[in-house]
Amino acid sequence: MRHLRDQSFFRLLVALAFVGAYTGVASGRTQVTCSFPAGQQPQPTEYFASLADNASHLAHVSIRFPQASGPITLNMPVWNALYQVRDFAANIENVHALLEAGQFVPVIHTKTSEWLVTAPASCVVVEYDIHLNAEGPFGAQLNAEHGFFNWAMVLLYSPSTRAQKMSIQFLDVPPTWSLHDVHVMGEASPGKVEQAAGIAANYDQLVDSSAEVGVFQHFEFQEDDATYHIVVHAGPGDYDAAKLEDILRRITHAEVDWMADRPFDSYTFLYHFPRGHGAGGMEHAYGTAIDVNAQRLNRNMMPVASVSAHEFFHLWNVKRIRPQSLEPIDYQGIMNTRALWFSEGLTSTVGDLMLVRAGLYGERQYLDRVASEISELQLRPAHRWQSVEDSGLDAWYEGNAFYRTPERSISYYNKGEVVGVLLDLRIRQLTHGRKSLRDLFHWMNDNYAKKGLFFPDSDGVQQAAETITGSSFAEFFRNYVAGVRELPYNDFFSFVGLQAAETTVRYATPGFTTSANLGGQPEVATVEANSEAQRNGIVVGDRILQLNGKPANQNVDYEVSRMREGASVKLRVAGRSGERNVRLKLVTREEQAFVLQNVPQVIPEQRAHRDAWIRGDDENGGVQ
């Protein structure tokens, strides 16, 4: 401990010497001052992000308050994108502030994510450096190749000006880099990025507009009188641009048609296709940021179609049809919500239906997808005691490897999607096919989103279902949303001539299962007792870095399950003892699974109900 203290003391001396000699600008960075170009109307808060040190993963942020009324409190969000407290302030260093004449004013670090700038009523510029090297749509990254900015991980904000207009501008951008963001800044070609200042209505809107700067591919298409931008940061050989555009044309048309609503003129799909681990998407009101593993993409375009359909529907469900429990956004603490089963789970329900409607899934593919979700739910013992509402409330635990085990928790994505399927079928049963989930979303869009209102979590969804059907849904929500009653699948599927039947499946396993950690890497979630994995020291929490010499992604379990019994897999594993190579022989396991199959005799009425259901249509030809 003495050695560590000596190092800290040395760093303190260096920092003090730096402050004494500081002239207000580091080498290669543009100085932000209180001088304004003639005729420019300053905003209450003005952000500048210098990329001069991009190769070091450092962004230099300047915040100008042209008319500060006195001391300024600044906060850094502790969470964003994921329902996880991630303490982004840990990446900040060298916070200081200067007045109009260039003199320093004291900055006091009052809390872990809070600073107080003790400035008089004057123009003030606050500066700091922030380390950005978190990959994926839930991160922010800056390096010699590109920059991806999830602004809530980058920008301090003042509670006193958070609701006011603010501007954002890049500085010191490499000359070959372009810009495209989701909404606020738009796009800029090489050499013009620094002139592309964007203005947001408030901080919430600004951080809902992720930005990509670097060398990337950009193409666009028109559909339903809207412009869709596709921005791809990847090797040109890692994806098929024509196929990607065709998929997105189909999805966007299907969903806009299904909702009979298009609350935007322009929408941006911002993709990263990394060679390493990568999976997931982050929704925005006017776009989405999505990561899909490049090797997986080359084999099959459906992963990108699936996540794109899900994220695109979020522009309605959660971004506009929004639960009251998520408003106003509290960037400084946990937000307790029981609505994620609807906001995430039913987004998956609709996303999969839209793949059918778009002609990307056939009936069998869709039914197999639903059956796999049922199987996943039923195989998690925790479904017997954790409700789908509570799984959303407990989302903040998902960074804990034990919490993600089947014995401890279910997924609000998984059960939410299954409950969404059953809710759709129940609405159809009660109305003889004349109403459906489509009508429920139309009602919520009309009565909440378009009126600028937030729905009261599960009670709001129940009210919508009861209003469009004229029937009570109290028992459904009590038993299957708030409660843990076993889902009587065939009471619902019989309406469309189907039954959920149990079967036995065989698959190869290395003796452990994984789940994705916050960084998107596969992390060991369970280890079988007396398995070869256990004998080789694999423990819960270990990270799987490589599978057979290639970077591992979130689909390790699926990739291994497709291999033959007796095959060997070579793993690169990282744990408490460091990184090591492990070779395991696969064994075969059997488990129960569900399939959706026809009832013994499907009558024409059931067939008609099914055809409308998997298209997402009402049987009267559409929503009335």
Predicted regions located by residue number:
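Bacterial N-terminal signal peptides that target proteins for export
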Residues: 2-13
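Bacterial N-terminal signal peptides
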Residues: 11-24
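Boundary at the C-terminal end of the N-terminal hydrophobic targeting segment
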Residues: 26-30
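Early extracytoplasmic/domain-onset interaction patches
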Residues: 32-79
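Non-catalytic architectural context of zinc metalloproteases
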Residues: 39, 52, 61-66, 81, ...
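Juxtacatalytic substrate-recognition/specificity segment
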Residues: 217-340, 346
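Post-HExxH zinc-binding segment in Zn-dependent metallohydrolases
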Residues: 288-291, 295, 320-321, 332-383
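C-terminal recognition in membrane/secretory proteostasis and scaffolding
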Residues: 351, 361-624
